[in-house]
């Protein structure tokens, strides 16, 4: 190990460290260490219990039997055996499916965001994190220590490299086509952002960006390229780490709820090279005493590094750093704000606000068996310590009983065989013996003594009690249904009790995973890349936008035990038998897909959900003909309806005509109308005869027709009565009616009594 041999070189002075923040009430290292020193006693008391539990599992320390010469030191690992049975039962529900998290929206506005978060979260646990290793450590830490402590963080590694990017020149839009292209791009970005990013030309994207900034419509033309330095992310994903409970000290005044803790302090090992990678985060590295901060000089830090091993290279030399997460009034306004600080030795190298978006401590505690009003839980070792000690004592007694016996040895009296025959006896040859001493009676064969039945019963009782305490059912006896009777109901009661105990532990583990998922969701919405490509299946990929991950969500962890899955599959199978073949085929396929999911057959489940039956051409043609037949029958029915409507209208019209005819006959209207027709016919005949007389050629010597007499006669027969009987009356009427005035253009000769003597004949 490297030593500081040059005593003339002064150590760095931590008091000369650079101020790290602009806070009004910047914290001092002494204030942070005061919290550490105040919480150490309660933390040490808890770690003593954890060490006792681990000693019981590993048979170390006080749990290891003392050495006694000639006596057995065997100690059965009862606690370890029960834990080994528990590991696989608790890890399989988390690893049995590729889909670990299920995200549901709180409001309808978060539906799309919930689906995106579910895709990203499950994708990260499948590809970015070693899910198998984490779940194994997660379960083993909880089962062994009674409490699992998970630290959630974010890993971002970038590399700067030079790339050629296009250079554009912007010009005012001159044609309608350019304006339409810009308008279509703006509309596509709103309707289909993914299609916009994938299909739109970079020049149009540049025009859109300029339009967003200035509001001016332009079109871009690439004029060349330029080399610029861009950041290429090498890693950008969340991290989850199982912490050693000895290396994290939590506020003991949190009343069993870590969310109420005012601080949590973690010690971890690092080196100068790791700190230099993050120059923007860590400062004052030149003030650190790297030699005195090695793990061997930090007794409160638990490490797996051997004490005799230490790297001499100053850049790789391991040192212990303390990271403080808590809440302080940094502005002096009475408001506690989340902060994080890191120090090595006596030098504060980091002090800033909590960078995580939820503003909480980045730790999740998962108890195995909860203890009232305590944030730490208890493992099975707390229950099995006495049973393991008793079982070990009984087992050592039985082994000592067998080991101290002279098994396989023979004894005989002295003088039974002489020297020659004794040698023959030992070499397996025929020998002679003294006839007074029968070898069958004199030679004694030593064997193992019979084990006392009480010892075997005691060992069996300890195993049964251990399995009853933990609820773990082993192959070799243990928890049985004999106390309930050797019937199916009794056995089912025992299995149900064990499965309920196991499910209760699983729920606590699932709750811890849910809290981890919630913290990662909050980080994804801030730290994730603008676009993230997520693999859904072997052929399907989805691009997730960081903006879509914001919202309020409920997160569930999809877990189930083999017993529960088997029971569900049996229930679904019984449901299929109940509904029979008379239900829609799609419902049957969905139920079969659920059964395939429960049996861990994702490919079969996917095939069942996406299967579409291929139609039979003959059946399809018959269906089409049946549809056409139904359409024709429908048209025929419509035509009959139209015919019935027309006949009904005709009947109504005939009824109206009959009613009208009846009314006209009763009122004399029809008779009067007939008279009018006859009168009009006679007048027409008269006028026809007069016209014929006027147009008929006269023979020589015939007199002309008397038109006045004919007109007068027509007037008499037509019943015309003007009321004017003489010339004097005509002159008086001419003053009011120009039809009686001889000089008027409206003069009517048929009304003049002088021209129509027949007018006077009527009276």
UniProtKB/Swiss-Prot annotation:
Signal peptide region: none
Which stretches does UniProt call biased (Polar residues)?
A: 680-689
UniProt cross-references to InterPro entries, sorted A to Z: SU10_portal (IPR056909)
Where is it found, in Gene Ontology cellular component terms? virion component
UniProt KW keywords: Late protein, Viral capsid assembly, Viral genome ejection through host cell envelope, Viral genome packaging, Viral penetration into host cytoplasm, Viral release from host cell, Viral short tail ejection system, Virion, Virus entry into host cell
Show the segment(s) annotated as Disordered: 668-706, 729-763
Which compartments does it reside in?
A: Virion
Quaternary structure, per UniProt, is:
Homododecamer.
- Identify this protein by name: Probable portal protein
Q: Which organism is it from?
A: Enterobacteria phage N4
Gene assigned in the entry: 59
